[in-house]
């Protein structure tokens, strides 16, 4: 896997992996990171990159929140709390807070913002492209953090789509 810093100028694209329920973040055919579901019955995902590996697992009474943990030690790295619209807040123990928002219905664009509203990255659901903000000064954000944000945002996009599909099935069955 290549580091995300080597891929910033060339563009990043998410693609589905063949024969399993996973995705790869690629730049010019080279893998930057991967996201795999633990099993078809599990809501836990494993994300891997040159900068680290993490577990994303649902938390809370109705499993609406998500916890990010280090896949080796199991230590909690961050907690995501969604709001009523599907967007939410990602909080790290060091105090850094990010807002994950989306705009659009048919082809939404998901954006990660600093707590002050500065855009960090955007992911277009239709083209599956990741755009890192040109104004972002990576000096205050580690490469690992930027990689984790790109991978976690894709995970939240997939989780939101699955939740919507489940709700549609529930409505169809009860109607």
Please provide the spans of the model-predicted regions.
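Intrinsically disordered, low-complexity proline/glycine-rich segments
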Residues: 1-175
């Amino acid at each position: 896997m290549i580091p995300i810093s080597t891929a910033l100028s060339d563009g990043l694209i998410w693609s589905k992996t063949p024969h399993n329920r996973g995705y790869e973040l690629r730049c010019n055919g080279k893998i930057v990171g991967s996201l795999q579901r633990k099993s078809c019955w599990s809501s836990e995902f494993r994300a891997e990159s040159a900068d680290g590996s993490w577990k994303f697992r649902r938390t809370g009474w109705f499993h609406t929140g998500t916890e990010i943990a280090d896949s080796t030690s199991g230590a909690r790295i961050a907690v995501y709390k969604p709001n009523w619209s599907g967007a939410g807040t990602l909080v790290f123990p060091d105090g850094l807070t990010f807002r994950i928002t989306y705009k659009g219905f048919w082809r939404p664009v998901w954006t990660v913002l600093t707590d002050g509203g500065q855009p960090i990255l955007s992911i277009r659901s239709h083209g599956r492209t990741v755009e890192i903000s040109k104004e972002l000064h990576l000096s205050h954000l580690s490469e690992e953090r930027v990689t984790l944000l790109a991978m976690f945002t894709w995970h939240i996009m997939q989780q939101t789509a699955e939740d919507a599909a489940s709700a549609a099935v529930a409505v169809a069955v009860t109607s």
